């Protein structure tokens, strides 16, 4: 399997392991740029993103690639367009050394202006499939890229998950830079913006932060809905918005909903967002879905038979990301089994790999059952007051999986596990996350429980076929 296709399959697995917000912010725009023996190099859009990947997701990436390739893989991180790599993630890092690296990296984080724009080279206008569902957003994005700051300012693009909002933001940046290479263009997610602000406040470098974001020609901020309820972030973004707008600079914003439906958003921000052009993106129709599959197949270097294209397009109606995921599973199965892509193979690939359908079957009861089965403890022991390590570890893994797989709140998890306090749950989740970076046995246990959980969840689906 080629590196591009391997990474698409890996991303499909990683999307099941981490929260949607984390996947969208940190993993979605990465690439596997090199695979040499037992060494994989992952490229991120910026040094800050590479930093977050190394600190938060290295263990999951390493585990996924090792499983797919059938051999231990060491993961390295770099930045798009840079030859010098970030420090590798060792397969057996010492916990003390890991903590030291994280601390020093945090101190070295630069907030001064840099040439990094955070753009993904795959997301261009040429690769964006236009249909009735996105025609207005596409036309507005083109106009903004060609004449930034002159009209449609701000441009606010909204729509459901996986419909192409992020693609358009990156495409604006690429086209604007192609027209005027000296422009200062910046793409950033609202979560990265918030994290950089927190880091700047912590290290007393807010002036650097403001200089960075208020001297940009085109600022594109993704998933603005995540700043809702964050007063300090909203305050800083409000002043950044005003500074750029008054200087005639272009602002492009994306969200999963229109401004009026974003809860806990400051009225003054809502007013400014609504003062520009609001362009929505709807789910693609059948013809657009077919065109997307053909284009994505071309990018992967495969020609999709027309009956397979129609089958997948009719089967998946919700969003583009699920279309891409289905295509990746089909291509991966064909290459792994050395078979041509046929309708029968596509049916098999989607039946076995319909992660969304399996995920919908997950329940707290299934999680607790899988943990009990793997560790051979009873449910009464798991939710009871016992504090033996043989019980505490499975309980903490249950907390972690209830959080990661089902997205339950800390309070809900505590209620499921014998009425425990939310601080106890938070400690358990954090401890598992921390130890997953260095404890190979724990990673194996979590992987085994997760595999058992998904097998249990597949059972009701299998009975339907």
Curated annotation (Swiss-Prot):
Recorded superkingdom: Bacteria
Sequence positions that bind ATP: 162, 164-166
A cellular component term, taken from the record's GO annotations: plasma membrane
Single GO MF descriptor: DNA replication origin binding
UniProt-annotated stretches for the region Domain III, AAA+ region: 118-334
Region called Domain II, residue ranges: 72-117
Species: Thermomicrobium roseum (strain ATCC 27502 / DSM 5159 / P-2)
Gene3D superfamilies, per the entry: 1.10.1750.10, 1.10.8.60, 3.30.300.180, P-loop containing nucleotide triphosphate hydrolases (3.40.50.300)
Start and end residues of each stretch annotated as Domain IV, binds dsDNA: 335-465
Chain positions covered by the region annotation Domain I, interacts with DnaA modulators: 1-72
Record keyword ATP-binding present: yes
Domain free text: Domain I is involved in oligomerization and binding regulators, domain II is flexibile and of varying length in different bacteria, domain III forms the AAA+ region, while domain IV binds dsDNA.
Positions of region (Disordered): 80-118
Subunit structure comment from the entry: Oligomerizes as a right-handed, spiral filament on DNA at oriC.
Descriptive protein name: Chromosomal replication initiator protein DnaA
Compartments (UniProt record): Cytoplasm
HAMAP family: DnaA_bact (MF_00377)
Gene designation per UniProt: dnaA
Record's keyword terms, sorted: ATP-binding, Cytoplasm, DNA replication, DNA-binding, Lipid-binding, Nucleotide-binding
Role summary: Plays an essential role in the initiation and regulation of chromosomal replication. ATP-DnaA binds to the origin of replication (oriC) to initiate formation of the DNA replication initiation complex once per cell cycle. Binds the DnaA box (a 9 base pair repeat at the origin) and separates the double-stranded (ds)DNA. Forms a right-handed helical filament on oriC DNA; dsDNA binds to the exterior of the filament while single-stranded (ss)DNA is stabiized in the filament's interior.
Biological process (GO), any one: DNA replication initiation
């Amino acid at each position: 399997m080629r590196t591009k296709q391997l990474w698409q399959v890996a991303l499909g697995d990683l999307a099941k392991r981490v929260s949607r917000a984390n996947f969208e912010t940190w993993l979605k725009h990465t690439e596997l740029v090199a695979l040499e023996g037992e060494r994989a190099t992952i490229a991120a859009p910026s040094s800050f993103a590479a930093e977050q990947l190394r600190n938060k997701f290295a263990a999951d990436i390493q585990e996924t690639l090792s499983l797919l390739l059938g051999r231990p893989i060491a993961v390295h991180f770099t930045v798009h367009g840079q030859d010098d790599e970030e420090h590798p993630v060792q397969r057996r890092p010492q916990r003390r050394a890991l903590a030291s690296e994280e601390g020093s990296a945090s101190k070295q984080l630069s907030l001064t202006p840099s040439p990094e724009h955070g753009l993904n080279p795959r997301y261009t206008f040429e690769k964006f499939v236009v249909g009735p569902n996105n025609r207005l957003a596409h036309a507005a994005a083109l106009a903004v890229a060609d004449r930034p700051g002159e009209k449609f300012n701000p441009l606010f693009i909204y729509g459901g998950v996986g419909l192409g909002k992020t693609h358009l933001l990156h495409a604006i940046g690429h086209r604007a830079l192609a027209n005027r290479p000296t422009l200062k263009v910046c793409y950033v997610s609202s979560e990265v913006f918030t994290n950089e602000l927190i880091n700047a406040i912590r290290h007393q470098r807010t002036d650097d932060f403001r200089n960075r974001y208020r001297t940009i020609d085109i600022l594109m901020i993704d998933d603005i809905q995540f700043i809702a309820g964050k007063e300090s972030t909203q305050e800083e973004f409000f002043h950044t918005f005003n500074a750029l707008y008054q200087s005639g600079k272009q602002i492009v914003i994306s969200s999963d909903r229109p401004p009026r439906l974003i809860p806990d958003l400051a009225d003054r921000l809502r007013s400014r967002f609504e003062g520009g052009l609001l362009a929505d993106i709807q789910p693609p129709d059948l013809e657009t879905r077919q065109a997307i599959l053909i284009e994505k197949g071309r990018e992967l270097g495969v020609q999709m038979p027309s009956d397979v294209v129609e089958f997948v397009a009719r089967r998946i109606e919700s969003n583009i990301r699920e279309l891409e995921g289905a295509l990746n599973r089909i291509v991966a199965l064909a290459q792994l089994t050395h078979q041509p892509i046929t309708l029968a193979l596509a049916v098999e690939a989607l039946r076995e790999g319909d992660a969304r359908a399996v995920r919908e079957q997950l329940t707290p009861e299934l999680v607790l059952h899988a943990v009990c089965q793997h560790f051979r403890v009873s449910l009464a022991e798991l939710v009871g007051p016992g504090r033996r390590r043989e019980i505490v570890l499975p309980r903490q893994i249950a907390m972690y999986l209830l959080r990661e797989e089902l997205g339950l709140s800390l309070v809900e998890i505590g209620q499921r596990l014998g009425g425990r306090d939310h601080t106890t749950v938070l400690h358990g989740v954090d401890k598992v996350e921390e130890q997953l970076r260095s404890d190979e046995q724990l990673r194996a246990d979590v992987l085994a429980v997760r595999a058992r959980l998904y097998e249990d969840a597949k059972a009701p689906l299998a009975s339907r076929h």
